[in-house]
């Protein structure tokens, strides 16, 4: 039923209204004439409700979060990364308008991280993530390939160039390398709030990466 209103919910021009609808629904401030006013959340929402963050990787998303007075999560892992990211986040801070939800700008940065005992091992594990990304943007998504499949894959020159560019926005390495890069990114984005996204073929490697980062 939610997708039936409005008639074309996936069109970007409806997105700001959908955010307003969500905020109104969570805070129980929708007008009586609103189509969603009679819908009740389950479990019920009392005095508190989840924080609403706007995730994005472009200036438009940052400006929307700023104008609505919402926290902004910058998706460093989407690809714009280090070249545009800090400027986009600074634009959000500069244009932030206080709201009932937030009195001052709040920033989180999402980063691809793969940590292993050695840099060589981390880069090897990351090859399956990189291939998965390549296949995803070229319409050939098939999940996360094994490291063996990734290393035996026949890459064209343009695909190799893409992989090199994509990996620059990822933090892969041994524990000390990862720590140094995360601290550097936190400083450049002027935030201590980082979200780590770890994508690799084997669960054990993903778990070990998280354990090493936590140490």
What are these regions (language model features)?
Residues 78, 113-115, 200-202:
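Active-site-proximal loop/turn and secondary-structure-junction residues that shape catalytic pockets
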Residues 180, 186-215:
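Generic C-terminus detector
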């Amino acid at each position: 039923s939610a997708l039936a209103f409005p008639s074309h919910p996936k069109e970007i021009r409806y997105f700001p209204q959908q955010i307003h609808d969500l905020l109104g629904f969570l805070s129980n401030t929708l007008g009586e004439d609103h189509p969603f006013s009679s819908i009740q959340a389950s479990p019920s929402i009392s005095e508190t409700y989840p924080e609403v963050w706007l995730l994005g990787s472009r200036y438009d998303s940052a400006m929307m979060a700023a104008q609505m007075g919402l926290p902004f999560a910058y998706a460093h892992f989407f690809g714009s990364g280090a070249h545009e990211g800090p400027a986009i986040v600074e634009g959000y801070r500069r244009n932030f308008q206080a709201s009932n939800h937030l009195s001052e700008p709040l920033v989180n940065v999402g980063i691809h991280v793969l940590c292993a005992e050695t840099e060589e091992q981390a880069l090897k594990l990351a090859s399956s993530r990189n291939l998965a990304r390549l296949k995803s943007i070229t319409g050939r998504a098939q999940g996360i390939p094994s490291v063996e499949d990734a290393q035996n894959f026949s890459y064209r020159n343009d695909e190799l160039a893409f992989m090199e560019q994509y990996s620059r926005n990822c933090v892969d390495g041994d524990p000390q390398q990862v720590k140094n890069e995360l601290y550097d990114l936190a400083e450049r984005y002027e935030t201590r709030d980082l979200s780590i996204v770890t994508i690799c073929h084997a669960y054990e490697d993903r778990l070990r990466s998280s354990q090493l980062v936590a140490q």
